[in-house]
Amino acid sequence: MEEVVAEELDDEEQLVRRHRKEKKELQAKIQGMKNAVPKNDKKRRKQLTEDVAKLEREMEQKHREELEQLKQLTFKDSKIDSVAVNISNLVLENQPPRISKAQKRREKKAALEKEREERIAEAEIENLSGARHLESEKLAQILAARELEIKQIPSDGHCMYGALEDQLREQDCALTVASLRRQTAEYMQTHSDDFLPFLTNPSTGDMYTPEEFGKYCDDIVNTAAWGGQLELRALSHILQTPIEILQADAPPIIVGEEYPRNPLVLVYMRHAYGLGEHYNSVTRLVNSATENCS
């Protein structure tokens, strides 16, 4: 009987953990949706509020149904516990009533639910006052002034190349992340004098040896190594196009200014993810006037 109860508790704990994870993922998704909509776009902000409320209602309903299903599975044991308590009361009328196993499970579930709600509330406060939220608000204002908004790129180590791939796609240039990485490494290897002086061994502080530089270029091609300004400089020469990097707390950076084409525009975010810096692409802002005319 004790083994059965342990299994039921494990099932309930697993369900609560899964619900907690799904709530966390939903909050991250909602934050991404909020970041993508400029603060001054009232129409889209209103629609966003409705969409967020709908997502939260649907998840809450789903979680209630799953908890109810689990409760039904344990209903039989609860009835057995209740009968056992009643028999005990008949035999030992003066004995104080005991808390049933089902009641203990309900109390434990309520405590876990309260803890989860407190964590969500703390996370919401942190999001609204933290560096990530402030950075997103500043970037939204900068982009809105240009009639642009952020286009999210996955944070998988390829984000800089992925953002450029997206920008090039808008110009009908079908270069993939893999192709951009390969061409970057090849350009840096054939122009090593332009890049080698800026690369140092983090352990010794010495400039990279030719062997270390070769491995650096191999990693560009064969791993999800994060790209930075050296790689952007190489890509601007490869594409013969300027690349403009917008950021929240500093003026824009433009590499490849010597080229006369319209720049590819990236957004650099220092606080977007806990693991470090991140690049996103941009897209044209669809304002309320355009929507009303369509």
UniProtKB/Swiss-Prot annotation:
Domain of life of the organism in this record?
A: Eukaryota
Q: Name one GO biological process term.
A: proteolysis
Knockout phenotype, as recorded, reads:
Mice are sub-viable and die between embryonic day 18.5 and shortly after birth. They show intrauterine growth retardation and a high percentage of ventricular septal cardiac defects.
Please provide the record's keywords in A-Z order: Acetylation, Hydrolase, Protease, Thiol protease, Ubl conjugation pathway
Q: Which reaction does it catalyse?
A: Thiol-dependent hydrolysis of ester, thioester, amide, peptide and isopeptide bonds formed by the C-terminal Gly of ubiquitin (a 76-residue protein attached to proteins as an intracellular targeting signal)
Region entry Cys-loop, spans: 153-159
The modified positions for N-acetylmethionine read M1
What are the GO MF terms of this UniProt record? cysteine-type deubiquitinase activity
- So where's the catalytic machinery, residue-wise? D156, C159 (nucleophile), H278
> Induction of this protein: by what?
Up-regulated by cytokines but followed by a rapid decline in B lymphocytes.
Q: What class of enzyme is it?
A: hydrolase
His-loop, as annotated region: 268-278
Q: Name one Pfam family in it.
A: OTU
In what tissue types does this protein appear?
Ubiquitously expressed. Expression is observed in several organ systems including the cardiovascular, digestive, central and peripheral nervous and musculoskeletal systems.
| Region entry Variable-loop, spans | 220-230
Tell me its EC number(s), please. 3.4.19.12
OTU domain mapped to chain residues: 148-285
What does the subunit section of this Swiss-Prot or TrEMBL entry state? Interacts with the eukaryotic translation initiation factor 4F complex.
Question: What does this protein's UniProt record list under function?
Answer: Deubiquitinating enzyme that may play a role in the ubiquitin-dependent regulation of protein synthesis, downstream of mTORC1. May associate with the protein synthesis initiation complex and modify its ubiquitination to repress translation. May also repress DNA synthesis and modify different cellular targets thereby regulating cell growth and proliferation. May also play a role in proteasome assembly and function.
The protein's name in its UniProt record: Deubiquitinase OTUD6B
Please report the organism this UniProt entry assigns to the protein. Mus musculus (Mouse)
